[in-house]
C-alpha cells in the first residue's frame, strides 16, 4: 500500500519525482505495523486451508504442533496468487483458472557484503540499479543507497538473476542442484568484469534460491 498509494514525497523543498522512503526500506514500515498490532500477530505459522462461509471466512493455521482456526468477516490475501488454489478448495472456477494461468520463473539473488566501494573499470559509477550489458543476470542494486551518511566505509550489493532461459520446472531443479560455490563463483566472475577488485573487497556472500520472483 505504501509503495503504490503513498510513496510520493511532496514538500516545498522536494523534487517532483521525490519518494518517501526510509534508510532501511520496508523494514521501517513493517516494524511500525508490528508495534501497532502488538499481541495480534501470529508468527512462525502456516496457513493450510481457507473456507468461506455465508458471513465469515475461516482460516486454518498450523502453529507449532497444533492447528488454530481463525474466523473473520473479511480476509485479505497478501501472498502469491498461485498458492490460493492449493489452500482454498472451493475457490471459484474463474478465479482459480486465472491463478493457475501464470508460469513463474525461479530467481537467484545474492547479497555481497563489501568492505569498501569497488573500483570502476569503465562506465558510470554505481547507482541504485546497475545493469551489466550482455549479462545473464539482471544486475545489482546498491542496498545502502538510502543511508544518508555522506561516506560509507562499506556497502552491500544485491545481485539478481531470473532463470528465464529454461522452463520454470527445469530452472527450479538447476537452482536447487547447483552448489552454492558454483553460483558464487559465477556471480563474482560476472561482477569482476566491471569491478576488478570485487573478490578482494567481498567479506561475505549470501546466496538465496527463490522458487518464484517477488
Where are these regions (language model features)?
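Active-site/ligand-binding neighborhood in enzyme catalytic cores
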Residues: 1-46, 56
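Conserved aromatic-histidine-acidic binding/catalytic patches
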Residues: 17-21, 25, 67, 100, ...
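Conserved SAM/SAH-binding loop
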Residues: 44-48, 63-64
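Charged, often glycine-rich, active-site loop that binds/positions anionic groups
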Residues: 55-65, 211-214
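Acidic/histidine-rich catalytic neighborhood
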Residues: 59, 68, 83
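Core beta-strand elements of the Rossmann-like FAD/NAD(P) dinucleotide-binding domain
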Residues: 65-74
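C-terminal segments that line or cap access tunnels to active or ligand-binding sites in enzymes
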Residues: 72-73, 79-213
